Curated annotation (Swiss-Prot):
Function (record text): Peptide chain release factor 1 directs the termination of translation in response to the peptide chain termination codons UAG and UAA.
Keywords: Cytoplasm, Methylation, Protein biosynthesis
Name of this chain's protein: Peptide chain release factor 1
Gene responsible for this protein: prfA
InterPro entries from the UniProt entry: PCRF (IPR005139), Pep_chain_release_fac_I (IPR000352), Pep_chain_release_fac_I_sf (IPR045853), Prokaryotic/Mito_RF (IPR050057), RF-1 (IPR004373)
Positions of modified residues (N5-methylglutamine): Q235
UniProt modification remark: Methylated by PrmC. Methylation increases the termination efficiency of RF1.
Length: 359
């Protein structure tokens, strides 16, 4: 890891020289690219300095502890060593994650689709809980969320919830949320105190960039239907045909949007989802053709694959792909997902590039 840090620090000096050149402003695109690289490298530098300083304090405490005789001071130093060791471990993981080379698609916005699976009303309620969890996580990362489409269940929660999320490194941290999320808990309507199991499926679809030439949709290939939007229980909530259903005839992909009162806005949102789904289908097809990529994936990303279990009675969350088990489910449901998402990103990087690059 030290070698990688030195390489980054050397590159940071080069970038700072390039940015300080007045001629750089004549090329806005290059300036923007260098500014982003400078921010990433500066973060690595700061994290490395924090780690070095913490290691020095820990070393001093251990040295003092080896010669100290006073019981009170010994107890204080022992506590300092314990705190220092935890800090070194945490800062090392943080630095390791920062050293992961950025993917050009890391900053792409994503469309996240959550659907109730097995478990009926309880599954729909858990969709609502997951929606809240992801909104809180997004807020903690400074990301923006936009509701694209919802289908409420009769007893609360959602049969389906689709939202767009944008911001720095959105795709990097959310792409591995795709799959089946299983929940084990006692429903509020359960009188015998029995634990029920239900499931929610999650799809994470990167939105194509505006200049992405891979995604071209011919208007001739679309069938667009309009109808009155309806809420929970099927009752109509709008007297005009504002809801939109778009069918991409060649692929058979169908997208419905009815949350907005404006037909124009519903159509625009539906087109965003449609483009993301078509792009995702192409990406999945290429991934399946690349055996090297398949072997390095954290699971298949298939919605039918069970990736995580949320056990409320035990306050436990387990990610089955990397064997990670945490006993702080309450914190995870409050949006503290970094402890899982960063572990997944690190795991994938180690598989793709080998542990020696970050060790």
């Amino acid at each position: 890891m030290e070698i990688k840090v030195l390489e980054c620090l050397k590159r940071l000096e080069e970038v700072e020289k390039q940015i300080s050149d007045p001629n750089i402003f004549s090329n806005p695109k290059e300036y923007s690219s260098l500014s982003k690289e400078h921010a990433r490298l500066s973060e690595i530098k700061n994290a490395h300095e924090s780690l070095v300083a913490t290691k020095k304090i820990l070393q001093d405490d251990k040295l003092a502890l080896s010669t100290e005789k006073d019981p009170e001071i010994v107890a204080m130093l022992e506590e300092g060593v314990l705190v220092g060791e935890e800090a070194v471990e945490r800062l090392s993981k943080q630095l390791e994650n920062l050293l992961i080379p950025p993917d050009p698609d890391d900053d792409l916005s994503v469309i996240m689709e959550l659907r109730a699976g097995t478990g009926g009303d309880e599954a729909a309620l858990f969709v609502g809980d997951c929606v809240r969890m992801y909104h809180l996580y997004a807020a903690s990362k400074g990301w923006q969320c936009e509701v694209l489409s919802t289908s409420e269940s009769d007893l609360g929660g959602y049969k389906e919830y689709v939202m767009g999320i944008s911001g720095a490194s959105v795709k990097r941290f959310l792409q591995y949320e795709a799959g089946t999320h299983r929940v084990q808990r006692v429903p509020e309507t359960e009188t015998q105190g029995r634990v029920h199991t239900s499931a929610v499926t999650v799809a994470v679809l990167p939105e194509p960039a505006e200049d992405d030439e891979e995604v071209f949709i011919d208007e001739k290939d679309l069938r667009i239907d309009t109808f009155r939007s309806s809420g929970a229980g099927g009752q109509h909530v709008n007297v005009t045909d504002s809801a939109v259903r778009i069918t991409h005839i060649p692929s058979g992909v169908v997208v419905t949007c009815q949350d907005e009162r404006s037909q124009h806005k519903n159509k625009a949102k539906a087109m965003r989802v449609l483009k993301a789904r078509i792009r995702d289908a192409e990406v999945q097809k290429r991934a399946q053709e690349a055996s090297a990529m398949r072997s390095a994936q954290v699971g298949s990303g298939d919605r039918s694959e069970r990736i995580r279990t949320y056990n409320f009675p035990q306050n436990r969350v387990t990610d089955h792909r990397i064997g990670l088990t945490l006993y702080n489910l309450d914190r995870v449901m409050e949006g503290e997902l970094d402890m899982i998402t960063t572990a997944l990103v690190t795991h994938v990087h180690r598989q793709l590039f080998g542990h020696e690059e970050t060790a």
